[in-house]
Amino acid sequence: MNQDFVRGVNQAILIIHSCEQKRLEQTKRRGRRLSIVGLIQDEISLVYGLVIGGVDRKAYIKMMEQEAQQAAQIGRLRVIVQDNGPIHRCHEVKQLWSKWENQGLYIFFLPTYCSEMKPIELEWQHLKKDELAGQMFDDELDLAYAVIHGVEVRGERGNYRTQRVKFNSNPAT
């Protein structure tokens, strides 16, 4: 075998193996949490909203009110299956259950510790892993835009409708 050819192959192999791994530097600034709340209807739609900080009962109630109104408008029952989170069972929400049922929105609860029965959890995992992984964001706004874009991309790829609910933000006083 030709020595120059072997030397050339060895050099090529060395060059291939000498690639540097990309480094992402973590910024010193620690941002606030971006929470997402959503309703998924498999292969049909994903309705979601973003909140800086935690999702409170007002945001949850707003989403449920919209779902109840839509159920009443189209005259078709809607069923929401959810976990037993404190927001889902707080006093203010419980008072609205009969109103929502009269509009055609029914709420059922999963047994505790059954995340595998919540398709929305799988959707959030894919959003993080497939659309957001390996990225750094300067602030919460950049992260929010990336989440919005990621949800839209997943909707297009999965051929389902996405709709973002916009919650009123409370201006700082």
Segments predicted by a language model, with ranges:
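Short, aromatic/basic amphipathic alpha-helical patches
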Residues: 91-101
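Extended, low-complexity cationic-aromatic segments
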Residues: 1-66, 167-168, 173
